Amino acid sequence: SFKVDTALIVAEERLQLADRLGEEYVNQGLMNLADALNKIGKHENALNVLDRVKRTGAVRKDTYFYYLYHTTYLSCYNDETEASRKRLFMRQIKAYKDTLIAISDPNTASYVTNQCGRLGLQGKWDEAIRILTGYYEHCTDTNPDKARVEYLLAELYLGKRDIQQAKHFLIRASITDIANAKKVYMSLQQLAILLFQEGDIARAYNYISCSLEDVSFGKARYRIIDIAEYLPIIKAANDSRIKADR
């Protein structure tokens, strides 16, 4: 199980120890701290911490460093409502996606997922799906990136309005998460929304409730905003369904 608040405490303690061990340990500690801050919803704080990382040769080649900038700006984009700031954040997302593609080995999940993500942003759904499917066919059950690849395939199919294929890969990603004992359930949450839109209220409510329990357990406040929009609507629909069945 994973608790974000615990991760923040550990990151802060590791950073204190890193001061005695040298620059690269400090840089790694700052990255861990930024990751934890982003996950508790303190995105601007996370960016400030990342800006403190010294751009050593090792850091400039570290995909984790650029991944953190990418995901933090993505969090900023998702939380923002003002159009001009959303455009600013999207420019940063695209820039860091390009950087990740440039420094990643072409045979890695980092390269392939960011390449396909960029194609998706350009509306090139079929090309992105073709490339990612090719990579996915070689993913074993022990591949730690398997669920992430399945989730991205679902997003790409959603982009081209193929709801059935999107549901297929969301189900697969959910199963992979459960098999790997990962209390993430982002795929389950998205699946709940699709099922609700199709009128399958009971399953939608069960799945989004499971996602909410995960967020509450892990104290992952960065994900509450993802659930908050649909949870009241799905709950109200489920309450109406139960009353109608009585």
Regions inferred by a protein language model and the residue ranges of each:
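A "functional boundary" signal
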Residues: 1-243
